[in-house]
Amino acid sequence: KNIIPKYKDLYFDPNNEYSVPYNVGMVGLVYNTKMVEGTPDSWSIMWDEKYKGQVLMFNNSRDAFGIAQFLLGIDVNTTSEQDWKKAYEKLKEQKPVVQSYVMDDVFNKMEGGEAAIAAYYAGDCIGMAENNPDLAFVYPKEGTNIFVDSICIPKGCQNKDAAELYINFLLRGDIALANAECLCYATPNRAVLDNEEYSLRDNEMLYPDEEHTPTTEYFHNLDSETLMLMTSLWDNLKIEGNDVMSVYIGLITFAVIVVVYFIYRTIRKKKRESMY
């Protein structure tokens, strides 16, 4: 009863038979106001030559392709091979300006001023901004991905009654409030949003007003053929260009280690022979 209606009956569980919404998140741009001119309003800034070597991109195929797809006006759940290849070409075009493809590394890099701009999840950007007051956050005008983390009971659960009690416990107003404060993600729980003690209830990163609320799309599960296509294109993207040099360096390093090892073995063998 505490769950806001718009987060019920989602595409992956139309009648909420199997899941209960727990957290809500969206992807946006976190940027350093001392390094970026003005307020960005488009994903296109992540392709801007002006910020070459200062852009952090998701090291996550679905999110990375999603950004390119939003920028190109392509459905993020498309099954068209041509659409996925268009997004791939857009990501290839971006690669020369990317400093690094990151996930958790984004925290140290953005908080430490090592990069100017990154795409990441709104809830995590709250912590970044607390650790570096020069950081700001915005949702691009082209739209973005929204996701709802949900709680489920596994099919093989041996104590279904206890599992249901635990879920009800998590949905309780005071417990849901503690979770929302700790995790810093948006909550789908009305009891939390109505609580004046909730410190993030007016946070624009989590709850943007109507004017700043972006167009959103949920990532649906891709069919196996489309998933294989995306994975293949992503692998191709990562091994091209600068990453090829990394592969060469790795191979050379390995070869040097092998040579040094055999030289060491040879010297050691000769020393042993000289003792007899």
Feature annotation, model-predicted:
Residues 1-114:
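Extracytoplasmic ligand-binding site segments that recognize negatively charged/polar headgroups
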Residues 13-16, 127-139, 201-204:
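Ligand-binding "clamshell"
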Residues 27, 34-37, 53, 61-65, ...:
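Solvent-exposed loop/turn segments at secondary-structure junctions
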Residues 43, 106-109, 125, 163, ...:
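Short, hydrophobic alpha-helical packing/hinge segments within bilobed ligand-binding/sensory domains
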Residues 84-93, 131-157:
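Periplasmic-binding protein-like
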Residues 111, 117-134:
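A ligand-binding cleft/hinge motif common to bilobed small-molecule-binding domains
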Residues 154-214:
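Mature extracytoplasmic/periplasmic domains
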Residues 211-276:
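Conserved C-terminal helix/tail region of periplasmic/extracytoplasmic solute-binding proteins
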